[in-house]
């Protein structure tokens, strides 16, 4: 967990939650939410969480472990929650969970999860250092940090293989 920074934010400081009711323009011919539409929303919320962490511009570099676990349908209330899990020199990993929230009792069921790699960039689009480190407060924060380190190694391995 080496971070050569003097300023830190906790994952909770940058946590972002966004909600939307699924409309007709969001569904495909099978009556389900378009996967691409959901990916677009997830990317936007991940970018907002990363921006909140670094207080700067970001761009998406990679998406890992995108898993569609359950469908979503017209009039479902979609909740997207993004939270930073790791901060490197110029990049951050953001976990994005997607839920459907019950109108009756507010319970949430997971429909999707993914990890986004966001790169801090200048106005010109060049990578630049992230000013804030990530202060790991909870046990879950530490578990996510170590999981991110493993995902980084997998990404490096895949990149070396030409993927």
Language-model segment annotations:
Residues 3-18, 73-74, 85-163:
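HotDog/MaoC-like acyl-thioester-processing domains
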Residues 17, 58, 63:
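Short coil/loop residues immediately preceding or within conserved phosphate-binding loops
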Residues 21-27:
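A short small-residue
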Residues 27-39:
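A conserved, well-ordered hydrophobic junction motif at loop->secondary-structure transitions
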Residues 29-32, 51, 70-71, 108:
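Short histidine-centered beta-strand/loop micro-motifs
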Residues 37-55:
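Active-site helix/loop of acyl-thioester processing domains in fatty-acid/polyketide metabolism
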Residues 61-71, 77-85, 100:
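Conserved interaction-surface patches within small, structured recognition/assembly domains
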